[in-house]
């Protein structure tokens, strides 16, 4: 499957894509406007969601069709934007995540535990790849702001 982990500053995902007993690497994070979308699950449904999100119209009927045409547990979307973290559930509705970090996918529990112990989303996904054969390195990372600006802001400079 996949591992996606996010905090309020960055989002990370493994790049392993599995098809039966084969695997290859592909991006799972997509920057669209001020949002970064992380996709997990059925590849066709995930890419259909990304295209829907890129559309200036974002027709809600098209979104419902994307989710209806697939098993509700086969598409997981995490959105990181300046307002926080959203999880698009299997019904196609975004849920705001109130915690400081979030993880989803087959390695999601391992990534959550790693972040509870202070690891970054990138480190958490890398740790999850060691425990989950369906997730694999390299890890893709996207920041809302350039990392240098984020670190300066944290130090109060």
State the predicted function of each range.
Residues 1-75, 80-83, 91-123, 146-152:
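Conserved short S/T/G-enriched processing/targeting/catalytic segments and their helical context
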Residues 126-155:
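Charged phosphate-binding loop/patch that engages nucleotide di/tri-phosphates or the phosphate backbone
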